Curated annotation (Swiss-Prot):
PANTHER family: RIBOSOME BINDING PROTEIN-1, RIBOSOME-BINDING PROTEIN 1. Residues 52-63 have a biased composition (Basic residues). Residues 45-91, 125-152, 173-780, 968-987, 1021-1082, 1224-1251, 1391-1416, 1509-1534 are annotated as: Disordered. Residues 197-736 are annotated as: 54 X 10 AA tandem repeats of [NASG]-[QL]-[GS]-[KRT]-[KR]-[AVTSEG]-[ED]-[AGVLS]-[ATGSV]-[PQLSA]. This is Ribosome-binding protein 1. The modification N6-acetyllysine is found at residue 1064. The modification Phosphoserine is found at residues 159, 165, 715, 747, 1032, 1091, 1110. Sequence repeats lie at residues 197-206, 207-216, 217-226, 227-236, 237-246, 247-256, 257-266, 267-276, 277-286, 287-296, 297-306, 307-316, 317-326, 327-336, 337-346, 347-356, 357-366, 367-376, 377-386, 387-396, 397-406, 407-416, 417-426, 427-436, 437-446, 447-456, 457-466, 467-476, 477-486, 487-496, 497-506, 507-516, 517-526, 527-536, 537-546, 547-556, 557-566, 567-576, 577-586, 587-596, 597-606, 607-616, 617-626, 627-636, 637-646, 647-656, 657-666, 667-676, 677-686, 687-696, 697-706, 707-716, 717-726, 727-736. Residues 395-428, 474-499, 705-718 have a biased composition (Polar residues).
Length: 1534
C-alpha cells in the first residue's frame, strides 16, 4: 500500500478524524456521568474539552506509532498531574512558575523575531506549565494545521516557503559546534531560547510533528518552536513533559538546562529548579550534585548545566530519558538535542518532517538519529545537547558517578578533564600529551582519557576533559565509559557527546564518534542517528559533518577510533584536534591544507560534494543551493540526489532539506541528506550519506574535515591512523563528507594507494577539485577479473555475449579457410561449428516459445489483476459507504443516549433537591407548626369528623361503582374467551382437514418425484453412454492417427526385426530340441533314482554307511554344480551386457560414419563450388587477355601499317616480330618521332598489363593446384578413415559372432544343469509355501473386513447419538419455552399484586376485592395461551402455503414433461433439471445446518431471558415487600 497515494491518505485522514470525534464524544459522556449538579457537570465538561484538545491529535498519532515503540511509553506521565492548557496567543511573554536562577555560562541566541521572549537570565515567576509564545511563523503554521497532522509530502512543500528566507543562516551554520546552552549550528540559531523547546503536543513555529509542516526542529508529534519535548512546551531544552525555556528535564520547567522534574534556568537536575547544572533535586548554579547546589560539576544523579550525571537532564548534556533543548535524552524531544523518538526543530525523529533536523523518515532540520530527534547531541538512547552518555543527562560533562567541579568521574582528581592516571592540561587522552582533547594515550589539554585526571568533565572511571567515557577520549560530555568531549555514549571517545567506543566531538551515541548528536554507531558532529552520518540531522546510514553515522568520525564528533582536536585519538600528540600522527589545522583533508572542510586533492569552499563544487555542504552529484533532496529542486535541505549549497543530497538541486522526491523546505525523508538532516546514502556538506565523500560529513571510509571515519585522524575530529583536518574517513581522503566507495571532488584514494603525506601532520593542497565522473568505467586488474569470471555462473546468452566482447577486444575474425600446414582437422572444426549453431538455433527457438507463452500468461494475469483491482475498488467503496453510515448511526445513538442521560441526571437532581428541602423542613418545623395549630385542630375536630364520614361514604360509593365496572368487564372478557375457544376448535378442525390434504399432496408429490427420478436416471445413463462413446470415438480417432504415424516407423523396424526374429526362432528351435533331450534325460534319471531307491530300501541294513557317504558326495557334487551354474549364469549375463554394449557401440559408430560421410559430402560440394568459381575467374581473365592483345595489335597496326598480320600467329610470336622489325620501321619514319614515343609508352603499358595478367593467371593456377591437392588429401584421409572404420566394424562383428556362440554354449550348459537340479521335492515345498502365504492373506483380509464392520457400526452409533442430541436440544427448547410462559405468568401476577398493593395494604379492604386480582391473573394466562395458539396457527398456515406452492411446482413440472414428451426432451434440459435438483438438495442440507445453529442460538437467548425475568421477579418481590412494609407503617401512623 502506497502511503502517499491520495485515496489512502484521504481514507486515513477521514478515519482518524472519525475515531477522534467518537473518542471525544465518549469522553464527554463519561465525564458528564459524575453525580454532581447540572451546573458542575457542564463546567467539568468544558474543562475536559479544553484539556483534551491536544489529546485528540495525540491519540490519532499514537494509534499509528506509539504501539511500535513501547520503550518510549515507560514514563509518559503528565507533568505534576496536570494536563497542559491551550496555547497562548503568540508574542505573549509567559512567566515561569518558580524563581529561576540565571546561569553564568549560557548565552541565548540572538532572536530573529524581536517580540519573542528570550531565555531567562534573571529569576522570573512562571505560569503553571504553559507553552511559551511561538514565533510569528509558528503562528502561521498553526493556522494552517489546526492540531491536524498532514502527510510528509505536503509538509516538505509548505516548509520550503517558511525556510526560504533562512537559507543564509543554514549555509554557514554547520561549521560550528554547539556548546553548553547555545543552540547548535544548523539549528535555527536566530530563534530565541525561550520560544523554542516545546512539548510533544505542542504546535508552533519550528518544531513540528511527524507529518507536520514547519520550520526546523519539529517534535515527533509536536508542532512548535525549535526544540519541543515529548509532551513539553517550553524553551529550547525541554524534558519529556517539560514546558520551560531551553534545557529542561523530564518534568522540568525552567531555563535552558533543566532536569527530570526541574523548572529553572539552564542545566537543571532531575527534580532541581535553578540555574544551569542542577542536580537531581538540586537548585543552584551550574554543575550541581545529587542534592547539591554548586559549581558546574555534578555527580552520579545530578542534573545540571554543563555536567550532569547518570539520570541528569540539563541544557546540553542529558542522559537516557531526558528531554531538554540542546541535550535531550532517550525520550526527550527538544530544540537541539532530542531523544530517540523525539522530533523537534533541529532534532526530529524517524517519521518526523520538519525543518532542518529530521530522522530516518524525517525531513527536517539538522540532528536526526535513527529514531532520534534531537539537536546536536544524541546518543544511542540519549538525546541531549553536546553531552549525552548512555544514561547521562547533564550540561557538559557528566559521568555515571561523577562528582567534581565540572563533570569529574568517580575517581577523578585534578584540574579540568583529567584521566585516571593522567596528568596534563585540559582534554588529554589515555597516554596522550598535547593540547586540549587528546586521544586514548594522550596527555594534554582538557578531555583526557581513561586514566587521565583532569579538572572538568570526568566520567565513572574517567578522568579527562568534560564528559569522558570509560574508553572514550575526547573533549566535553562523555558517557558512562566514554572519554571525549561533551555528550559521549557508553564507550564513546570524542569531543562532545561521544558513543560507547567512540572518540570524537560532543554528543556521541553508544558506539558513536562524532560531533554533537551521534547515533548508536554514528560518528559525527552533533545529532547523529543510529547509523546516521550527516551534518546535524542525518538519516540511518548518513555520514556527515556535525552528524555522522555508524563508523563516521568527524570534527567535533569523531567516530569509533577517531581522535581529534578537543577529542583526539589513541596516540595523538599535538595542538587541539590532532590525529594519531597528524598535525594540522582544524578540518583538513588527508593531504589537504586549506580552508575548513577540504578534500584530499581539493581546494575550495567548505563542504563540497562528490562531483560538486559549490557552496558548503554539497551532495554527491549536486551543485546548487544548500540542503537539497534526492531528486528535488527547491529550497534548502534537499534529499538524496540533490545538488546545492550546504547540505545537498545525492543528486538533488534545490533549497534546504528536501524529501526523497520532494521539492520543499527542510524536513526530508528517510534517504534525504540535508545540511542538518541528511538521509541514508546522501552525502552533503554537513550531512552526507554512506557512500558519499564530501564536505564535513564523511562516509564510512571517508576522510575529511570535521567528521572523520573509522581510522581517520584530523584536526578537531581525527581518526586512529588518519592525518587530516576534520572529517576524514577510513581510507578515503576528502574535504567534508566523503562516502564509502565514492570518488569525490576532494580526492579519494584507492585502497592500495599511499600518498606521501599519509601519516604526517598537515596534509597539502592538491588543487581545486574537478568533480570526478561517478559513471566512469571500473578498471579491474587481469587476475581479479579472471578469478571473478571463473567463479561466476552464466546463461548461454550471457556466455555468448562475453565471447563476442572478447573476440571484439582481441580483434579476432575466425576464418573458414585453413592452410595446408594447419594442424587441426578442418572437418572436425566444421562439425563443431555446425553443432554449436544448431544448438544456438534450438535454444533461441525454445527461448522465443517460452517468451511467447510467458507473454500470454502475463497478459492473462494482467487482465485478471485488473478485474480484481476493479472489484476490490468497488468493494472498498461499498465498505467505505457502509462504514460512514455506521459511524453516523453510532454518532446519532451516542447523542441520543447522551441526551437521555442528561435528562435522567436533571430528574435525579430535582428529586435530590426536593428531598433536601423536605429534610430541611423536617420534624422540628412540623412540631412547631403542630403546637401552633393544635388549638385550631381541636376547635375544628367536630367539623372534621363530619367531613371524614361524608368522605368515607363517597369513597365507598365510588369503590362499589368500580367493582360493578370490573365485574362487567370480566363478564365481557369471559364471553370473548368462550368465543375464541369456539373459533380455536373450528380452526383445529380446519387444520386437521388441511393436514390430510397435505399428506395426500405429499404422497402424490413423492410419486411424481419417483417417476421423475426414474426418468432422470435413464436420461443420465444415456448421457453417460453417449459421452463415453463420444470420448472413446475421439480416443480411437487420435489413436488411429498415432497408429498411422507409428505404422510408418514400425514398417522400417519390422524389416530389421524380422531378420532378427528368424535368427532367434532358429536359435529357439535348437533350444527346444535341447530342452526335450534334457527332459528325456531327466525322466531317465528319475527312473534310475527310483530303481536305486528300491535297491537301497532292499539293502538298507547292509549299506547304510555306504549310502550316507554316497549321499554326502552327491550333495557336495550338487553344491559344486550349483556354484558352477551360478558362475556360468554370471558369465552369461556379463556376455549379454558386453553384447549390448557392443551393439550400442556399433550404432554409435554407424551414426558417426553417417555424420562423417555427410561432412565429407559437404566439404566436397564446397570444394567443387570453389573450383567452379576459380574456373570462371580463369575464363574471364583469359577473355580479358585476348581483348587486350587484340586491342594492342589493332593499335600497333594502326600506328605501324608496315607490320603485316597476314599469317595467324600467336601473340608472343607477333611481339617477337615487332621487336625485330620495330627499329627498322622506326628508322624508316624518323619524322614521326613523337607518335612513335607515344606508341612505345603504350607498348610498355601493354607489356606491363600483360605481365600482370600472366602473374594473376599463375597465381590462379597455383591456387587451383593447391585446392586440388587439398581435395586429394581430403579424399585420401576420408578413404583411410573409411578403411579404419570398416576394419573396426568387421572386428566387432567377429567378436559379436564369437560372443553369440559362447552364449549359446553357456545357455545349453545352464539348461542341462537346471534339468539335473530340478526335483519334485522343490516343487512340493514351493506349493506348500504358496498355500501358507494364501492362508495368511485370507486371515488378513478377514481381519480387515471385521475392522471395517466395526467402523461402520461406530459411525451408525455416532449418527444415532447426534440424532438423540438434536431431539434433546428440541425438548430442552420446548421446556425452556414452557418455563418462559410460567415466568411471564408469575410476572403478570406480580404486576397485578403491585398494582393492587394499595388496596391490599389498607386494613379495611373487604375480601371481595381479592377476587378481581385472581381474575386478572387468569385473564393474562388465557391471553398468553391464545398468543401461543395464534403463533402455532401462523406456522401451520405458512407450512400449508409452502406445501401448496411445492405441489403447484411439481404439477407444473409434470405438465411440462408431458407437454414436451420423452422424445422431445433433450438430454441437456434433463441435465440442467438434475443440476437444479442437486442444488436444491444442497440448499436443504445447508438450511438444516442453519436451523440447527439457530436452535442453539434460540436456546441461549431463552436461557438469558429466563435469567433476566427471574431477576425482575426477585426485584418485584422486593418492591412488594417494601410496599407492604410502607403500607403497614402508614396504617399505624394514621
Amino acid at each position: 500500500m502506497d502511503i502517499y497515494d491520495t485515496q489512502t491518505l484521504g481514507v486515513m485522514v477521514f478515519g482518524g478524524f472519525m475515531v477522534v470525534s467518537a473518542i471525544g464524544i465518549f469522553l464527554v459522556s463519561t465525564f458528564s456521568m459524575k453525580e454532581t449538579s447540572y451546573e458542575e457537570a457542564l463546567a467539568n465538561q468544558r474543562k475536559e474539552m479544553a484539556k483534551t484538545h491536544h489529546q485528540k491529535v495525540e491519540k490519532k498519532k499514537k494509534e499509528k506509532t506509539v504501539e511500535k515503540k513501547g520503550k518510549t511509553k515507560k514514563k509518559e506521565e503528565k507533568p505534576n498531574g496536570k494536563i497542559p492548557d491551550h496555547e497562548p496567543a503568540p508574542n505573549v511573554t509567559i512567566l515561569l512558575k518558580d524563581p529561576v536562577r540565571a546561569p553564568a555560562v549560557p548565552v541565548a541566541p540572538t532572536p530573529v523575531q524581536p517580540p519573542v521572549v528570550i531565555a531567562p537570565v534573571a529569576t522570573v515567576p512562571a505560569m503553571p506549565q504553559e507553552k511559551l509564545a511561538p514565533s510569528p511563523k509558528d503562528k502561521k503554521k498553526k493556522e494552517k494545521k489546526v492540531a491536524k497532522v498532514e502527510p510528509a509530502v505536503s509538509s516538505v512543500v509548505n516548509s520550503v516557503q517558511v525556510l526560504a528566507s533562512k537559507a543564509a543562516i543554514l549555509e554557514t551554520a554547520p561549521k560550528e559546534v554547539p556548546m553548553v546552552v547555545v543552540p547548535p549550528v544548523g539549528a535555527k540559531a536566530g530563534t530565541p531560547a525561550t520560544s523554542t523547546a516545546q512539548g510533544k503536543k505542542a504546535e508552533g513555529a519550528q518544531n513540528q510533528s511527524r507529518k507536520a509542516e514547519g520550520a526546523p526542529n519539529q517534535g515527533k508529534k509536536a508542532e512548535g518552536a525549535l526544540n519541543q519535548g515529548k509532551k513539553a512546551e517550553g524553551a529550547q531544552n525541554q524534558g519529556k513533559k517539560v514546558e520551560v525555556a531551553p534545557n529542561q528535564g523530564k518534568k522540568a520547567e525552567g531555563g535552558q538546562n533543566q532536569g527530570k522534574k526541574v523548572e529553572g534556568a539552564q542545566n537543571q537536575g532531575k527534580k532541581a529548579e535553578g540555574t544551569p547544572n542542577q542536580g537531581k533535586k538540586a537548585e543552584g548554579a551550574p554543575n550541581q550534585g545529587k542534592k547539591t547546589d554548586g559549581a558546574p560539576n555534578q555527580g552520579k544523579k545530578s542534573e545540571g548545566a554543563p555536567n550532569q550525571g547518570k539520570k541528569a537532564e540539563g541544557a546540553q548534556n542529558q542522559g537516557k530519558k531526558v528531554e531538554v533543548a540542546p541535550n535531550q535524552g532517550k525520550k526527550a524531544e527538544g530544540g537541539q538535542n532530542q531523544g530517540k523518538k523525539v522530533e523537534g526543530a533541529q532534532n526530529q525523529g524517524k517519521k518526523a518532517e520538519g525543518t532542518p533536523n529530521q530522522g530516518k523518515k524525517a525531513e527536517g532540520a539538522p540532528n536526526q538519529g535513527k529514531k532520534t530527534d534531537g539537536a546536536p547531541n544524541q546518543g544511542k538512547k540519549s538525546e541531549g545537547a553536546p553531552n549525552q552518555g548512555k544514561k547521562v543527562e547533564g550540561a557538559q560533562n557528566q559521568g555515571k558517578k561523577v562528582e567534581g567541579v565540572q563533570n569529574q568521574g568517580k575517581k577523578a582528581e585534578g584540574a579540568q578533564n583529567q584521566g585516571k592516571k593522567a596528568e596534563g592540561t585540559s582534554s588529554q587522552g589515555r597516554k596522550e600529551e598535547g593540547t586540549p582533547n587528546l586521544g586514548k594515550k594522550a596527555e594534554g589539554s582538557p578531555n583526557q582519557g581513561k586514566k587521565v585526571e583532569v579538572v572538568q568533565n570526568q566520567s565513572k572511571k574517567v578522568e579527562g576533559a568534560p564528559n569522558q567515557g570509560k574508553k572514550a577520549e575526547g573533549s566535553q560530555n562523555q558517557g558512562k565509559k566514554t572519554e571525549g568531549a561533551s555528550n559521549q555514549g557508553k564507550k564513546v571517545d570524542g569531543a562532545q557527546n561521544q558513543g560507547k567506543k567512540a572518540e570524537g566531538a560532543p554528543n556521541q551515541g553508544k558506539k558513536v564518534e562524532g560531533a554533537q548528536n551521534q547515533g548508536k554507531k554514528a560518528e559525527g558532529t552533533p545529532n547523529q542517528g543510529k547509523k546516521a552520518e550527516g551534518a546535524q540531522n542525518q538519516g540511518k546510514k548518513a555520514e556527515g559533518a556535525p552528524n555522522q553515522g555508524k563508523k563516521a568520525e568527524g570534527a567535533p564528533n569523531q567516530g569509533k577510533k577517531a581522535e581529534g582536536a578537543p577529542n583526539q585519538g589513541k596516540k595523538a600528540e599535538g595542538a587541539p584536534n590532532q590525529g594519531k600522527k597528524a598535525e594540522a589545522a582544524p578540518n583538513q583533508g588527508k593531504k589537504a591544507e586549506g580552508a575548513p572542510n577540504q578534500g584530499k586533492k581539493a581546494e575550495g569552499a567548505p563542504n563540497q560534494g562528490k562531483k560538486a563544487e559549490a557552496a558548503p555542504n554539497q551532495g554527491k552529484k549536486a551543485e546548487g543551493a544548500p540542503n537539497q533532496g534526492k531528486k528535488a529542486e527547491g529550497a534548502p535541505n534537499q534529499g538524496k540526489k540533490a545538488e546545492g549549497a550546504p547540505n545537498q543530497g545525492k543528486k538533488a538541486e534545490g533549497a534546504q532539506n528536501q524529501g526523497k522526491k520532494a521539492e520543499g523546505a527542510p524536513n526530508q525523508g528517510k534517504k534525504a541528506d540535508l545540511v542538518a538532516n541528511q538521509g541514508t546514502k546522501a552525502e552533503g556538506v554537513a550531512g552526507q550519506g554512506k557512500k558519499a565523500e564530501g564536505a564535513p560529513n564523511q562516509g564510512k571510509k571517508g576522510e575529511g574535515t570535521p567528521n572523520q571515519g573509522k581510522k581517520s585522524e584530523g584536526s578537531p575530529n581525527q581518526g586512529k591512523k588518519v592525518d587530516a583536518s576534520a572529517n576524514q574517513s577510513k581510507r578515503a581522503e576528502s574535504a567534508p563528507i566523503q562516502g564509502k566507495n565514492a570518488d569525490m571532488v576532494q580526492s579519494q584514494e584507492a585502497p592500495k594507494q599511499e600518498a606521501p603525506a599519509k601519516k604526517k601532520s598537515g596534509s597539502k593542497k592538491k588543487g581545486e577539485p574537478g568533480p570526478p565522473d561517478s559513471d566512469s568505467p571500473l578498471y579491474l586488474p587481469y587476475k581479479t577479473l579472471v578469478s571473478t569470471v571463473g567463479s561466476m555462473v552464466f546463461n548461454e546468452g550471457e556466455a555468448q555475449r562475453l565471447i563476442e566482447i572478447l573476440s571484439e577486444k582481441a580483434g579476432v575474425i575466425q576464418d573458414t579457410w585453413h592452410k595446408a600446414t594447419q594442424k587441426g582437422d578442418p572437418v572436425a572444426i566444421l562439425k563443431r561449428q555446425l553443432e554449436e549453431k544448431e544448438k544456438l538455433l534450438a535454444t533461441e527457438q525454445e527461448d522465443a516459445a517460452v517468451a511467447k507463452s510467458k507473454l500470454r500468461e502475463v497478459n492473462k494475469e494482467l487482465a485478471a489483476e485488473k478485474a480484481k483491482a476493479a472489484a476490490g475498488e468497488a468493494k472498498v467503496k461499498k465498505q467505505l459507504v457502509a462504514r460512514e453510515q455506521e459511524i453516523t448511526a453510532v454518532q446519532a445513538r451516542i447523542e441520543a443516549s447522551y441526551r437521555e442521560h442528561v435528562k435522567e441526571v436533571q430528574q435525579l437532581q430535582g428529586k435530590i433537591r426536593t428531598l433536601q428541602e423536605q429534610l430541611e423542613n423536617g420534624p422540628n418545623t412540623q412540631l412547631a407548626r403542630l403546637q401552633q395549630e393544635n388549638s385550631i385542630l381541636r376547635d375544628a375536630l367536630n367539623q372534621a369528623t363530619s367531613q371524614v364520614e361524608s368522605k368515607q361514604n363517597t369513597e365507598l360509593a365510588k369503590l362499589r361503582q368500580e367493582l360493578s365496572k370490573v365485574s362487567k368487564e370480566l363478564v365481557e372478557k369471559s364471553e370473548a374467551a368462550r368465543q375464541e375457544e369456539q373459533q380455536r376448535k373450528a380452526l383445529e378442525t380446519k387444520t386437521a382437514a388441511l393436514e390430510k390434504q397435505v399428506l395426500q399432496l405429499q404422497a402424490s408429490h413423492k410419486e411424481s418425484e419417483e417417476a421423475l427420478q426414474k426418468r432422470l436416471d435413464e436420461v443420465s445413463r444415456e448421457l453417460c453412454r453417449s459421452q463415453t462413446s463420444h470420448a472413446s470415438l475421439r480416443a480411437d480417432a487420435e489413436k488411429a492417427q498415432e497408429q498411422q504415424q507409428q505404422m510408418a516407423e514400425l514398417h522400417s523396424k519390422l524389416q530389421s526385426s524380422e531378420a532378427e526374429v528368424k535368427s532367434k526362432s532358429e536359435e529357439l528351435s535348437g533350444l527346444h530340441g535341447q530342452l526335450k533331450e534334457a527332459r528325456a534325460e531327466n525322466s531317465q534319471l528319475m527312473e534310475r533314482i527310483r530303481s536305486i531307491e528300491a535297491l537301497l530300501e532292499a539293502g538298507q541294513a547292509r549299506d547304510t554307511q555306504d549310502a550316507q557317504a554316497s549321499r554326502a558326495e552327491h550333495q557336495a557334487r550338487l553344491k559344486e554344480l550349483e556354484s558352477q551354474v551360478w558362475c556360468l549364469e554370471k558369465e552369461a549375463t556379463e556376455l549379454k551386457e558386453a553384447v549390448e554394449q557392443q551393439k550400442v557401440k556399433n550404432n554409435d559408430l554407424r551414426e558417426k560414419n553417417w555424420k562423417a560421410m555427410e561432412a565429407l559430402a559437404s566439404a566436397e560440394r564446397a570444394c567443387e563450388e570453389k573450383l567452379r568459381s576459380l574456373t570462371q575467374a580463369k575464363e574471364e581473365s583469359e577473355k580479358q587477355l585476348s581483348l587486350t592483345e587484340a586491342q594492342t595489335k589493332e593499335a600497333l597496326l594502326a600506328l605501324l601499317p608496315a607490320l603485316s598480320s597476314s599469317a595467324p600467329q600467336s601473340y608472343t610470336e607477333w611481339l617477337q616480330e615487332l621487336r625485330e622489325k620495330g627499329p627498322e620501321l622506326l628508322k624508316q619514319r624518323p619524322a614521326d618521332t613523337d607518335p612513335s614515343s607515344d606508341l612505345a609508352s603504350k607498348l610498355r603499358e601493354a607489356e606491363e598489363t600483360q605481365n600482370n595478367l600472366q602473374a594473376e593467371c599463375d597465381q590462379y593456377r597455383t591456387i587451383l593446384a593447391e585446392t586440388e591437392g587439398m581435395l586429394k588429401d581430403l579424399q585420401k584421409s576420408v578413404e583411410e578413415e573409411e578403411q579404419v572404420w570398416k576394419a573396426k566394424v568387421s572386428a566387432t562383428e567377429e567378436e559379436l559372432q564369437k560372443s553369440r556362440v559362447t552364449v549359446k554354449h553357456l545357455e545349453d550348459i545352464v539348461e542341462k544343469l537346471k534339468g539335473e537340479l530340478e526335483s519334485s521335492e522343490q516343487v512340493r515345498e514351493h506349493t506348500s509355501h504358496l498355500e501358507a502365504e494364501l492362508e495368511k492373506h485370507m486371515a488378513a483380509a478377514s481381519a480387515e473386513c471385521q475392522s471395517y464392520a466395526k467402523e461402520v457400526a461406530g459411525l451408525r452409533q455416532l449418527l444415532l447419538e447426534s440424532q438423540s442430541q438434536l431431539d434433546a436440544a428440541k425438548s430442552e427448547a420446548q421446556k425452556q419455552s414452557n418455563e418462559l410462559a410460567l415466568v411471564r405468568q408469575q410476572l403478570s401476577e406480580m404486576k397485578s399484586h403491585v398494582e393492587d398493593g394499595d388496596v391490599a395494604g389498607s386494613p379495611a379492604a373487604p375480601p371481595a376485592e381479592q377476587d378481581p386480582v385472581e381474575l386478572k391473573a387468569q385473564l393474562e394466562r388465557t391471553e398468553a395461551t391464545l398468543e401461543d395458539e395464534q403463533a402455532l396457527r401462523r406456522k401451520l398456515t405458512a407450512e400449508f402455503q409452502e406445501a401448496q406452492s411445492s405441489a403447484c411446482r411439481l404439477q407444473a413440472e409434470l405438465e411440462k414433461l408431458r407437454s414436451t414428451g420423452p422424445l422431445e426432451s433433450s438430454a441437456a434440459e434433463e441435465a440442467t433439471q438434475l443440476k437444479e435438483r442437486l442444488e436444491k438438495e444442497k440448499k436443504l442440507t445447508s438450511d438444516l445446518g442453519h436451523a440447527a445453529t439457530k436452535l442453539q442460538e434460540l436456546l441461549k437467548t431463552t436461557q438469558e431471558q429466563l435469567a433476566k425475568e427471574r431477576d425482575t421477579v426477585k426485584k418485584l418481590q422486593e418492591q412488594l415487600d417494601k410496599t407492604d412494609d410502607s403500607s403497614s407503617k402508614e396504617g399505624t401512623s394514621v
